[in-house]
């Protein structure tokens, strides 16, 4: 997505949420300065735009944001050999790994979307993404069918056994043997949610958070406008711009037009045939928007349309020929 200015061209389409949070409006300070922070995380960039309350320590808050993101990388990155995720991936058959709250929340959401999407989203494809060179390792050639079959046999969300947290007991995840997690289809969305939550707990009710293109809008700008973002359109495709008011709302994108993107259908182990070139999903949770955008981008576009409509998702799909489909939930926001 692209962070947009407040001015609205005549040809643009506008999508707005159904409700305005009256509490957020009541806490609005028209004199608050808008401050931008940014940094690096998860192999990409993060950016925060905040309406900074009087007396706030901007440097300390920015440091807290970076520390929060660094903590999630230490838990869930498949690029960091010392991360908890990598330790789980190489754990012994039948062993249980205790999950911190962030990791547990991501796994629970990932398993929910995996089930609801009939496996179109799968957090347990690390073996498959590895043989395709979508992780730290860079194979010299694409995998052959036998290699893909072996990776698929060692993968799959249905092999995961999650023991959820109870009173005074951490959640834990069983290693079924040789299974590798890859949370890249959901982690950036969760990170954006986590930063927005950190800011809210610090008394910042109005902020726009972006992590690698996944965005959360909390509250609104000091001038009373929402946080505007424009949904991206792949190069060479001409469509009327679609601008979204991110007020207590998040947006995530997926597609092969994104730099470095390479989507796999978890059910076949191959690049999906007939999938959308670009997918955008709006949701109150950026983590859920991220996971659903990943799911919709991994299947043929007709299946993605049916899935988005069935789940009531506010989604836009763009076909490779330039055709556009807006889900009923997104159309209702225009």
What is each model feature region?
Residues 1-334:
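Mature catalytic core of soluble alpha/beta enzymes
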